[in-house]
């Protein structure tokens, strides 16, 4: 078998040599891809999840069919660069690590955001960093990096955040009793998000996340959008919090971050909100489910977590294996199923000339679970993340110039919640069934997840 050795002595599968020449898929394969990937992608919800369709597609493990089809596609055309004919024109699927690296390292200067993303996100967060280009992108990136402390291992308010997280986890466990699931995590992370971004005074402000959620549900319709009835009230509330920032909150840092009139500070905040509530709640719940279903991993985590110890922000930062568990949940079931880009100019990709206005697709649901490339594709491998902090195969937090500005903060929050939950008890995963000795499913319905709490004594 072709392969290479990792620093830990484990073998990483290497696929047979493939051409880097762009191939054109036939009409039948384009239709199959649309039915297997795009239809479920749209029905599940591009910006926030639809419970019914999440249930349907998790039931048939639809992403497993996507992975199998993409492997067949790559084998049939013997290429990592394949054109598909989809609605709106040709789309280029990029499978190779070198191709993905090139695209992400040249985003958004050459590879801007696709129309699907820009149109939908503009409905609830116009002028946001993630859909910006040119000088506006540079200005907004600098602002986001300053507030989110992107270049620091631990955020300057990390101790204050940790104290609040401990209090909220204790409060949540007091309320939920023996069994808990998605609704409990949703409430917990909304309260955490509100206090991290807006301060203690906002802890019970359910109106703000509710309005954002409604606008994100509307955005799932993408091209049938008018101005939301929630928009003005939502941004009015954000301006209120910005005008009177609370100590130890992200809004308290906003006035001191580099900005111009074009930064549009209020439009940067919704992205922080949904990333810290629905997205991070989903990933943290899945990570706890994985830990609970893998006894060896749980015991390794608990070696670093003494139930009688009240850990500090530095301790949380040192829990690298626990953070790896969170990263594995993100890898195994990426909440961002794909990264879609559009070439703003002509570009050369792996020796191929790519015309301007070409849609480019990086398919996380495939790249993260490609067993022909990754020896651990369908297993739980937190140790992988102990040495590899950036790998262009895995783009749940993106990579390159547009890597998530809040990556370190999001991982810190999720790890802190997991550490506090595990310090306070043990948990049995009741639903879904995850077997540590078998390949993990490609779909995970967070809405149906149930855990049983066994309190610490």
Each model region followed by its residue ranges:
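Conserved cytochrome P450 K-helix E-x-x-R motif and the immediately C-terminal K′/meander segment
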Residues: 59-74, 78, 310-350
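Cytochrome P450 catalytic domain signature, combining two hallmark sequence patches
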Residues: 101-120
């Amino acid at each position: 078998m072709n392969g290479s050795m990792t620093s830990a002595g484990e073998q990483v599968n290497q696929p047979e040599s493939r051409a880097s020449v762009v191939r054109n898929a036939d009409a039948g394969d384009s239709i199959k891809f649309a039915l297997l990937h795009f239809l479920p992608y749209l029905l599940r919800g591009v910006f926030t999840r639809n419970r019914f369709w999440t249930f349907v597609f998790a039931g048939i493990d639809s992403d497993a069919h996507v992975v199998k089809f993409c492997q067949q596609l790559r084998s049939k055309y013997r290429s990592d660069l394949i054109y598909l004919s989809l609605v709106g024109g040709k789309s280029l699927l990029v499978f190779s690590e070198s191709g993905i690296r090139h695209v992400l390292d040249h985003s958004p200067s050459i590879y801007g955001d696709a129309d699907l993303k820009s149109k939908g996100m503009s409905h609830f967060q116009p002028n946001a960093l993630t859909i910006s280009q040119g000088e506006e992108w540079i200005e907004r990136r600098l602002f986001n990096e300053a507030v989110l402390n992107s270049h620091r291992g631990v955020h300057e308010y990390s101790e204050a955040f940790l104290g609040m997280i401990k209090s909220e986890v204790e409060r949540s466990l007091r309320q939920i009793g023996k069994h808990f699931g998605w609704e409990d995590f949703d409430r917990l992370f909304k309260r955490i998000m509100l206090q991290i971004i807006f301060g203690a005074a906002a802890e019970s402000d359910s109106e703000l996340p509710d309005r954002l959620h409604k606008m994100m549900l509307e955005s799932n319709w993408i091209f049938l959008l008018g101005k939301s009835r929630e928009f003005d009230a939502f941004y009015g509330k954000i301006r209120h919090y910005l005008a009177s920032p609370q100590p130890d909150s992200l809004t308290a840092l906003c006035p001191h971050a580099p900005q111009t009139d074009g930064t549009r500070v209020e439009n940067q905040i919704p992205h922080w909100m949904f990333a810290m509530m629905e997205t991070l709640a989903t990933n943290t719940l899945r990570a706890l489910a994985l830990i609970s279903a893998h006894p060896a991993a749980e015991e390794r985590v608990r070696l670093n977590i003494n139930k009688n110890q009240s850990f500090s922000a530095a301790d949380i930062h040192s829990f690298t294996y626990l953070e790896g568990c969170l990263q594995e949940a993100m890898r195994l079931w990426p909440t961002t199923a794909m990264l879609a880009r559009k070439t703003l100019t002509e570009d050369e990709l792996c020796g191929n000339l790519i015309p301007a206005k070409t849609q480019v697709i990086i398919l996380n649901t495939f790249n993260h679970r490609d067993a022909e490339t990754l020896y651990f594709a369908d297993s739980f491998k937190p140790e992988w993340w102990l040495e590899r902090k950036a790998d262009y195969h895995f783009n749940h937090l993106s990579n390159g110039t547009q890597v998530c500005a809040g990556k370190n903060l999001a991982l810190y929050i999720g790890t802190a919640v997991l550490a506090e939950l595990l310090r306070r008890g043990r948990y049995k995963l009741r639903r879904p069934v995850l077997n540590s000795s078998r390949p993990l499913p490609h779909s995970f319905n967070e809405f149906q997840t149930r855990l049983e709490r066994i309190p610490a004594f």
